[in-house]
Design a protein with these regions (language model features):
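Glycine-rich anion/phosphate-binding loop at the beta-strand->alpha-helix junction
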Residues: 1-53, 91, 105-106, 111-129, ...
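A hydrophobic, small-residue-rich beta->alpha segment in the mid-to-C-terminal subdomain
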Residues: 50-106, 111
Length: 140
């Protein structure tokens, strides 16, 4: 199913995969799932504003800003695709901390540097990804 602006994709399940998926494969597996999707309009519900423009995940324990590179490679000399993905994840994390938690940008930057974890999601496809982990316990 394709819907413009849906920002939802599921597939390519892995039973095991190291951080970064570097060799085009992992412990592949089958997937059977039931999903219930709810349309969340901007300004309504609990979804952060950022999630309406860019992939963003949330678990019971963490907020997860995501950064992806351009599948066609670097643009305007911005550096490697991984650099672009990391920069995008950090910018998305900053926006989340400022807009949703009311944090000053300079404090948010310092927090991300000192306490958040940024991990390579995968580098095997044309689009590479980085995701951040912002622990909710830091804000309890």
């Amino acid at each position: 199913m394709h819907a413009p602006g849906a920002l939802f994709y599921v597939g390519d399940p892995h039973h095991a995969m190291g951080d970064g998926e570097v060799a085009l494969t992992a412990m592949e597996g089958s997937l059977r799932g039931t999903f219930r999707l709810t349309v969340c309009k901007e300004g309504e519900g609990d979804a952060p504003r950022l999630a309406h423009r860019y992939p963003f995940a949330e678990t019971a324990d963490a907020w997860i800003p995501i950064g992806l590179s351009d599948p066609d490679g670097s643009v305007d000399g911005q550096g490697s695709d991984l650099d672009v993905a990391l920069r995008t994840a950090v910018v998305n994390a900053l926006e989340f901390l400022e807009q949703e938690l009311g944090m000053d940008r300079a404090i948010a930057y310092a927090y991300l540097s000192a306490a958040a974890d940024f991990t390579i999601s995968q580098v095997v496809d044309r689009t590479v990804g980085v995701h951040g982990i912002i622990a909710k316990s830091h804000f309890a």
